[in-house]
């Protein structure tokens, strides 16, 4: 079976800026891998290329053995994606959004249970635009995992959360690992990477510094 994520010599430029520079990366099954680095290090761009949102300028990417762009329709149902800053429908209620995502899966997690686990029960009927930033982040995480994907990409999953919410999210990510889900997360917090990851890859200026 192919490894869940494989990048070979991946480069992405935006004008004169090289966001990712010749990156090699391999993620093993059921591994939690943290991409650790400061803002602007190239972490989000790396994840966006793996998700098929951004096309690399050079190198090759395989996710679950597939090309994230050419095979996106086949890949999409098998991966969970949590975007930085949430990315929901402003007028949709929290529970509606989660139920909509769950409906695309043959064997979803129970949306009501997931909302409760993430402390969103009281916000279930609140529209997305009226949720706090931390609530939007937690809802984005719920949407990423409700379909029981094989592989989850989490971009700064606890950004803007208080300490209690952060611990709840950490426990949920730990549960994904125990269930055999492969997780790739980005963070600029060393403590978060150490707490969650089986392997930490430090990225700066779009290149791997250490692993």
Tell where the protein language model's regions lie, with residue ranges.
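Hydrophobic anchor residue at the start of the ABC signature
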Residues: 141
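Helix-to-loop junction immediately C-terminal to a conserved catalytic motif
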Residues: 51
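Conserved ABC ATPase "signature" region
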Residues: 99, 103, 108-123
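Conserved ABC transporter NBD signature motif
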Residues: 59-70, 75
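Catalytic Walker B motif of ABC-type/P-loop ATPase nucleotide-binding domains
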Residues: 152-156
């Amino acid at each position: 079976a192919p490894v869940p994520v494989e990048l070979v010599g991946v480069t992405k430029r935006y004008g004169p800026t090289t966001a990712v520079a010749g990156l090699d990366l391999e993620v093993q099954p059921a591994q939690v891998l943290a991409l650790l680095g400061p803002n602007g290090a190239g972490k989000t761009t790396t994840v966006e290329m793996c998700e098929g949102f951004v096309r690399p300028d050079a190198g090759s990417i395989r996710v679950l053995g597939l090309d994230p762009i050419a095979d996106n329709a086949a890949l999409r149902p098998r991966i969970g994606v949590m975007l930085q800053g949430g990315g929901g429908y402003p007028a949709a209620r929290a529970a509606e959004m989660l139920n909509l995502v769950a409906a695309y899966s043959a064997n979803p997690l129970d949306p009501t249970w997931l909302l409760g686990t993430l402390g969103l029960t009281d916000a279930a009927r609140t529209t997305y635009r009226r949720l706090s930033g931390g609530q939007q982040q937690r809802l984005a995480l719920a949407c990423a995992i409700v379909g029981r994907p094989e592989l989850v990409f989490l971009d700064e999953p606890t950004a803007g959360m208080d300490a209690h919410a952060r611990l709840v999210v950490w426990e949920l990510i730990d549960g994904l690992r125990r269930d055999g889900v492969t997780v790739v997360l980005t963070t600029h917090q060393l403590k978060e990477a150490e707490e969650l990851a089986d392997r930490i890859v430090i990225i700066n200026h779009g290149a791997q510094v250490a692993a």
